[in-house]
Amino acid sequence: MGHKVNPTGIRLGVIKEHNSVWYADKKDYAKNLLNDIQVREFLDKRLVKASVSKIVIERPAQNARITIHTARPGIVIGKKGEDVDRLRREVSDMMGVPVHINIEEVRKPDLDARLVAQNVAGQLERRVMFRRAMKRAVQNAMRQGAKGIKIQVGGRLGGAEIARSEWYREGRVPLHTLRADIDYATYEAHTTYGVIGVKVWIFKGEILGGMEQVRADKKASGKKGSK
């Protein structure tokens, strides 16, 4: 059987940026990497209800900058910014350097693979039929302007004795075209029958200008957000 490469990993440096952006000496590299993983796990656990899509960690000289992309910024920030201040202190203790936390709102959660996967997994945990959950998520994404979307679920679907996987697709999802902007994510639904895995691929269009266009678009959206 053929194995598919991770759609995000194969596009790094082509049209996708890394989620950890820093340089380290050889002796510090493993320590920093482990620290990043621990911080991500801590934030994912702490902000489980905040619909967190992505966490970007940057390490400029002797401090750290963490950008949390979320569909519910209010939950992360908390009343008068209390929650985000507490979060900053805790993460700073973990990393051993001063930490600055930025919150970026995800304006279209139906077009974010991780949030779609979380949503489908949440429905499966609430015992919604898996086909209905997949179909609803696919229709919402296509309505929001996705060029194509594929959702796959695998496990003891509907409480069946034998585990299997099923998928639903609409539109185009070109995994081999490197200039294709494919957003990919996985998530787990913990049901009474066991764990059901959810995979989501969303095709948002082609990026013809490579990394230069990605950075230009990012800069433009940043200016728009600051206005």
UniProtKB/Swiss-Prot annotation:
InterPro entries: KH_dom, KH_dom-like_a/b, KH_dom_type_2, KH_sf_prok-type, Ribosomal_S3_C_sf, Ribosomal_uS3_bac-typ, Ribosomal_uS3_C, Ribosomal_uS3_CS. The gene is rpsC. It comes from Marinobacter nauticus (strain ATCC 700491 / DSM 11845 / VT8) (Marinobacter aquaeolei). It comes from the Bacteria. Residues 39-107 form the KH type-2 domain. HAMAP family: Ribosomal_uS3_B (MF_01309_B). Part of the 30S ribosomal subunit. Forms a tight complex with proteins S10 and S14. Keywords: Ribonucleoprotein, Ribosomal protein, RNA-binding, rRNA-binding. This is Small ribosomal subunit protein uS3. One of its GO terms (cellular component) is cytosolic small ribosomal subunit.
